[in-house]
A protein has these predicted regions:
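DNA major-groove recognition helix of helix-turn-helix
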Residues: 37, 67
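DNA major-groove recognition helix of helix-turn-helix/homeodomain DNA-binding modules
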Residues: 47-62
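A short, Lys/Arg-rich alpha-helix, primarily the initiator
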Residues: 1-17
Length: 68
């Protein structure tokens, strides 16, 4: 069975955006964004994903990847 992997670090690097800057734009704490970035979460709210995509000007598929 595969798994969904978060690639937030890659998208942030492409956009040259720091965790602090993204945190301020999204309205999520640095700690929670860090957990998202490192994949130490089991779920993410659509509203949070939407806010991240808005801040990074990307699509959910740019952040989420299905790996077999």
């Amino acid at each position: 069975m595969g798994e969904i992997v978060l690639r937030l670090d890659r998208v942030m690097a492409d956009r040259k955006m720091s965790l602090k800057e993204l945190s301020e734009k999204v309205g999520v704490s640095n700690v929670n964004l860090s957990k998202i970035k490192t994949g130490k979460i089991s779920a993410i709210r659509f509203s949070t994903l939407e806010a991240i995509c808005e801040a990074l000007d990307c699509q959910p598929g740019d952040i989420l990847e299905y790996v077999k």
